[in-house]
């Protein structure tokens, strides 16, 4: 089956949040409640959600919270992918994927991010793995 990139929208809030509750990589920062909070956290950043998921059929395999934000660097505006001015949460994967499958999906995720970065002239992106998520604690 083919992998599909789907943008996060209200239609997918429930499955996205359910995925967050099931994935050992996800934490509260990945949920749509926190995404909505961060979108409104610092209005000066003019945050726009670029969050997306990777699906195979009806199954979500990975989610990636991502915002396009405008940052003022000494009166020069640049665009970056961030999360209310902070690091973006690292992509979260479905439990039980093999390492090779995770790598395949991660390559796709970063190719999508690269494509969006070129489209919007993004200067940088930073991700953070939450130290409270299950997979980090178990490593």
Where are these regions (language model features)?
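N-acyltransferase acceptor-side catalytic subdomain
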Residues: 1-139
């Amino acid at each position: 089956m083919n992998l599909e990139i789907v943008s996060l929208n209200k239609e997918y809030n429930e499955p996205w949040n359910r995925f967050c509750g099931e994935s050992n990589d996800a934490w509260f920062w990945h949920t749509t409640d926190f995404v909505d909070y961060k979108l409104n956290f610092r209005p000066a950043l003019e945050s726009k959600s670029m969050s997306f998921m990777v699906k195979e059929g009806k199954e979500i395999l990975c989610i990636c919270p991502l915002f396009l934000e405008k940052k003022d660097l000494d009166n020069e505006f640049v665009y970056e992918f961030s999360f209310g001015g902070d690091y973006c949460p690292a992509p979260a994967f479905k439990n039980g994927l093999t390492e090779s499958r995770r790598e395949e999906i991660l390559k796709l995720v970063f190719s999508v991010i690269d494509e969006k970065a070129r489209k919007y002239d993004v200067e940088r992106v930073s991700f953070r793995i939450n130290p409270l998520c299950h997979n980090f604690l178990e490593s």
